Structure formats: structure tokens, C-alpha cells
Amino acid sequence: MAKSKLTKAKEISKETKERVLERQRYKSISGVALTPYNTEFHHVIFRSESGVGYEFNIVAITSEEHRAFHDHQNILVNGRKRYTYIEFGILMKNHLKLHYSGWEESKCRFHKYWDEEDYKMTRME
């Protein structure tokens, strides 16, 4: 059975993962070095909120940060509290705003007539 446009839009491709890692210079947005064993890709606008899997809605974070964020816990870096759940969410959004001209939450949500081309955002270097 063919996947729906919504299901396809939520998926994160290998190419997107690589672009996200390059954008972040293989570090979590907290500054922790990422390895193949501790890296997870997070939808800033959640999949459950129709967040798309394109690079302008994805950040790479450690598996520990990912678990803590989804559990609404403090984010620890090197065993110390670094961010509250809310601060980490703001950090992720600010990271994307810094890298994508015109970044807005609404552009990261799939809509009935959503088309990736309509929501292309220019990546700033």
C-alpha cells in the first residue's frame, strides 16, 4: 500500500539527516559531540502536530537529550543541569531561526495542500 503524503512528509531521509549533521558540525545543539551511537533526530514541531521531516524542522541531539526532552525533564550535559525542558525547546527553535531565513512554526507543519516547494526556506551560511 502506498504511503500518504502526510506519512512521507513526516519521514526523515538519509540525505536530510546528513545535511542536519553538517549544519550542526556533528554536534548536538547543546554542544555535545555526536557519534553514530548517541545521535537522534528530533522534529522541532512534533510529528504528532504534523511536523514535517525536512531539515528546517529537524535538529540532531543526543539520545539522552531526546529522551529527557520528551519526558519534560531537565537536559543534562556532562552530568550537570544545563537546560530546562522549556529552555531546550527555545534553543532548538532559535537554532533553526538562525539557519533558515523566514523560519516559522507554521511552515514546518503539513497542511492538506502542503508542497515542499511552497515551504522551501533559504539556508543561511
What kind of feature is each model-predicted range?
Residues 58-87:
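Short Cys/His-centered divalent metal-binding micro-motifs
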Residues 40-44:
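Histidine-centered catalytic micro-motifs used for acid/base chemistry in nuclease
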Residues 46-47, 70, 74, 99:
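Alpha-helical and His/Cys-centered functional microenvironments
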Residues 45-58:
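Short linker/helix segments within small regulatory modules
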Residues 6-12, 55-61, 70:
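Short, exposed beta-strand "edge-strand" segments with a Pro/Gly-rich flavor and a Y/T-containing core
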Residues 28, 49-52, 77:
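Residues in flexible loops and secondary-structure boundaries
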Residues 1-26, 31-38, 80-125:
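A boundary/linker detector
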